[in-house]
């Protein structure tokens, strides 16, 4: 399943998101959700421990001035890769 987080993790039921993640799921951080990728924040450690791949939309990182501040554990992708993820996953959950 593809999970997309478009809101700030501080304004989301992040605990529920983590509970619903399953091994093999993928999470795309976009819009204000990319703030979860910033090194040193409390949400990043939870994502590192989850059995998933985590991506962040590069355009949203640039728009928020975060490109140099994200963790190396987060995979930065463009819109083409975003489309590939949506095609890959028949089911999706937006947060």
From Swiss-Prot:
Coiled coil: none annotated. GO terms for biological process: tRNA wobble position uridine thiolation. InterPro entries: DsrEFH-like, Sulphur_relay_TusB, Sulphur_relay_TusB/DsrH. It is found in: Cytoplasm. It holds the Pfam family DsrH. Keywords: Cytoplasm, tRNA processing. GO terms for cellular component: sulfurtransferase complex. Belongs to the DsrH/TusB family. HAMAP family: Thiourid_synth_B. Part of a sulfur-relay system required for 2-thiolation of 5-methylaminomethyl-2-thiouridine (mnm(5)s(2)U) at tRNA wobble positions. Heterohexamer, formed by a dimer of trimers. The hexameric TusBCD complex contains 2 copies each of TusB, TusC and TusD. The TusBCD complex interacts with TusE. This is Protein TusB. It comes from Escherichia coli O81 (strain ED1a).
